[in-house]
Regions:
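Hydrophobic positions on the alpha1 helix immediately C-terminal to the Walker A/P-loop
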Residues: 19
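ATP-dependent NMP and nucleoside kinases share a basic, alpha-helical "lid"
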Residues: 87-164
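Conserved lysine of the Walker
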Residues: 16
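Residue-level signal for inorganic ion chemistry
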Residues: 35, 83, 112, 126, ...
Length: 209
């Protein structure tokens, strides 16, 4: 039987992970956070001291890169780098910022493409990211594109960071959101855009509902 896929795309802080996680739980599907996968690569780049703007340096790290994804009894996706649980480490603000640079490299996207598609071949999934409906799973049965005002997305990101015990200022977070939006929209490979057959949802006011 063919597996069912639901693709959820959108910029940082639009509410992708919240919607994807709840949808997967209700349907009994697997939730795949592709952003966590790219952050894991970014963490490897940072730990190796490689220059993220130097494709050759980053590509040299991909050969033999050991990334694994698993799920605990609570259903939370956990990421492993060379056998080490890096689920919390990849959520640091510095790693998130680096992930956007790393994700713009064609070699990285090609390297991770089959890894992501394999999850959807093996089980029913709800997958979120920037290019799920356009590149990773272009034939997904349901496609949703979430968006929200940058200021609202920055507020959500700030709250998330503080809940993790990380100090941050609103202006710095907003600046990072806007910078990442620009990087995601203008990158040469798999830029952030709404799939033609995706349903558009603006979540700006949902926090206040």
């Amino acid at each position: 039987m063919k597996c069912v896929s639901i693709a959820i795309d959108g910029p940082a802080g639009a509410g992708k992970s919240t919607l994807a996680r709840k949808t997967a739980r209700e349907l009994g599907f697997l939730y795949v956070d592709t952003g966590a996968i790219y952050r894991t690569v970014a963490l490897r780049v940072r730990e190796a001291g490689a220059d993220p703007s130097n494709p050759a340096q980053v590509e040299s790290l991909l050969e033999g890169l050991d990334i694994r994804m698993d799920y605990g009894e609570d259903g939370v996706q956990r990421m492993y780098l060379s056998g080490r649980d890096v689920t919390e480490a990849i959520r640091e603000n510095s790693v998130s910022a680096l992930a956007s640079q790393v994700a713009a490299l064609p070699a990285v996207r090609d390297f991770l493409l089959d890894f992501q598609r394999r999850q959807a071949r093996e089980r029913d999934v709800v997958m979120d990211g920037r290019d799920i409906g356009t590149v990773v799973l272009p034939r997904a049965g349901v496609k949703i594109f979430l968006t929200a005002a940058p200021e609202v997305r920055a507020e959500r990101r700030l709250l998330e960071l503080r809940q993790r015990g990380q100090e941050a200022e609103f202006d710095a977070v907003l600046s990072g959101i806007l910078r990442r939006d620009e990087q995601d929209r203008t990158r040469a490979v798999a830029p952030l855009r709404q799939a033609e057959d995706a349903v558009l949802l603006d979540t700006t006011r949902l926090d206040r509902a």
